[in-house]
């Protein structure tokens, strides 16, 4: 790994630091924000508004992923992640100065439009710049830095949420200035000088020729996004004897610890195994355990529960992303990887709407999520055992 490659990896990691940071800022500050900035005080109303805004943010990710995925294949990966972080920074800073909830929703949509491509385009750049075993550690580092972004946001929870938003926006502007000097991917440079450029970023070309890996990789992401959508509702039912906001922060520290462990394990796994199947199977087992044991969790064991849920976090995302990116040609690689991640994230809209309708009755909620978790696990396990991956990007 040369000096320039290390610099590229560092700047990519800092971008995902901000991505994870912002996701966590909303998680740790939304109670205070809704009360102070918009006058929403009822705990159930706060939870429903959180689901609503989360759905809007996920909508921004879906639109942004498709838009910036196409642009990254047409005009370059570096160009896209440079200006998308600028959009995020400006709208995030503006968001703390509005008192109208609908204007706030619009700004959050634009913020997540800007963040949409961070993980997927960074993944594409890593697999295009580095050989597989080094890329595996690069992906682990990317996600671990993202997790530290989440930890930073949780620690910043002692400050005003406005300070947290300003920090995210200003940090994004700093990253924007660093990204001006990054070199473009050699695979994109080759594409740019070839006749294949006319197909670059084509949704029609992607769906017509690569719909199978697109669909199956999306379905594989579902367990992770199911968990990160439902986990705060689970904490709500555990928080009877402790302040909800405090319990969320304790839970998140456990979740982040589990994420880091998972990232490190995935890095070692990729040094010795050429297929992600075993890793996925183990994670699906952990997924089912995490859903079924929550009814036995108390405030005293919430940190450990966070660690368990976190184990299906970083490594699971790293694994599917690294392998999925190699299944598409350069002209649609960014679009495909962005779309898979965005569809996974925006599945949170579906889950969020359902969970919001169940949340008033814990018994019904518990039964329904157990049934849904089993169905998801069965679907993903069938895919894992039956899907034969065909790698297009092959590197030694």
Feature annotation, model-predicted:
Residues 107-144:
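Cytoplasmic helix-loop-helix junction between adjacent transmembrane helices
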